């Protein structure tokens, strides 16, 4: 059910997290949640402060150029996979299975699916295996009892970190969801491994810490999600300063054709009906709210160094154009393909090379059969997440991680039917508001993890019975 907000604390009404210039859509959304007014003077001061912050070095500053002398890998490239039993991990292993002459697995880490992990060990014969849930180590050993191949097994978080920095690995595929993937990614960077990045939190929460670290260790961060891979492919070989604008495409999610006034009636089952992609519950809800796209705006800023004013979102219902860039001469470059995550994952593993894919398992795009491609501007009233994401991005520092963690908790509460669909936006805004006075512009890894946990706890404390006011625990 939707949560009725009776009133807010007076100081919260005076100083809101959202920028009034971009957050006005909230005031037009007629639902059970009254949204407060914005203090323009506070916004102006925030922008002045934010503009003085030194941004971390982007992974790819508007262009991607292969360094002179770089050669293709001779023989199967050794890789580690963190999160091997999840969606990214299993698709990565599908790629390895199809290309044994190009890739080999040296280490695997999983959370708790030891049955699938054991099957993966038997098939790919890694040297090292980790299971994050330490209580399942004996079960994994039992599942491998009749296996001729006996890898080293290290349990717990330390095991996942050891997989990430395995000495034989050249590239590490990071497929763990949430801040749990941050420490292994940092360990891989410190060990000099290139990162096939499928964990959004690495940059959204950890960007201010991770990017300088990657620069220090001369590590490549290669985006494995479809939108950022599309941008990465489009900027290959661009001259310095040629990038003018980034255009992220979005399907629009389950409610792209719903009228705004019907959103207060949304049920969990409605939000889990994605029109194009088959994904997990959390990311499917994020597609419905467009929070996934808001988070991708932040990730694009960190990856490519574009200002937030130069990153746009366009609704593209067919999900064939995965994203676009505009160059200084007004040319627009796009990357097209069927909605298939294997393509961007493969490119992170093979870059800068292109690997042949059989059309038997990788259907080729037929534009004539496809027909028309359509586009429309996103509705800020229907998708308040965009205003929240842009505001968090401009605030920078720990605010982007707080936004991501609060959204993750809010979606969990929604899926568990503890809050309504529209309450997701309010929980995120209130959590970001509460973090304003504690924002750290250049956080350490410990501070990033601390505020991730804090945001989840604060979001969970916003109870219906108190009108979304925090409940002390």
Curated annotation (Swiss-Prot):
The keyword Ligase does not apply. Keywords: Chloroplast, Isoprene biosynthesis, Manganese, Metal-binding, NADP, Oxidoreductase, Plastid, Transit peptide. NADPH binds at residues 85-88, 111, 113, 199, 201, 280. Pathway: Isoprenoid biosynthesis; isopentenyl diphosphate biosynthesis via DXP pathway; isopentenyl diphosphate from 1-deoxy-D-xylulose 5-phosphate: step 1/6. Its cofactor is Mn(2+); Mg(2+). One of its GO terms (biological process) is isopentenyl diphosphate biosynthetic process, methylerythritol 4-phosphate pathway involved in terpenoid biosynthetic process. Induction: By the mycorrhizal fungus G.intraradices colonization in roots. 1-deoxy-D-xylulose 5-phosphate binds at residues 200, 226-227, 251, 274, 287, 292-293, 296. It is found in: Plastid, Chloroplast stroma. SUPFAM superfamilies: 1-deoxy-D-xylulose-5-phosphate reductoisomerase, C-terminal domain, Glyceraldehyde-3-phosphate dehydrogenase-like, C-terminal domain, NAD(P)-binding Rossmann-fold domains. One of its GO terms (molecular function) is NADPH binding. The keyword Iron does not apply. Its EC number is 1.1.1.267. PANTHER family: 1-DEOXY-D-XYLULOSE 5-PHOSPHATE REDUCTOISOMERASE, 1-DEOXY-D-XYLULOSE 5-PHOSPHATE REDUCTOISOMERASE, CHLOROPLASTIC. Enzyme of the plastid non-mevalonate pathway for isoprenoid biosynthesis that catalyzes the NADPH-dependent rearrangement and reduction of 1-deoxy-D-xylulose-5-phosphate (DXP) to 2-C-methyl-D-erythritol 4-phosphate (MEP). Required for chloroplast development. Belongs to the DXR family. This is 1-deoxy-D-xylulose 5-phosphate reductoisomerase, chloroplastic. It comes from Oryza sativa subsp. japonica. The gene is DXR.
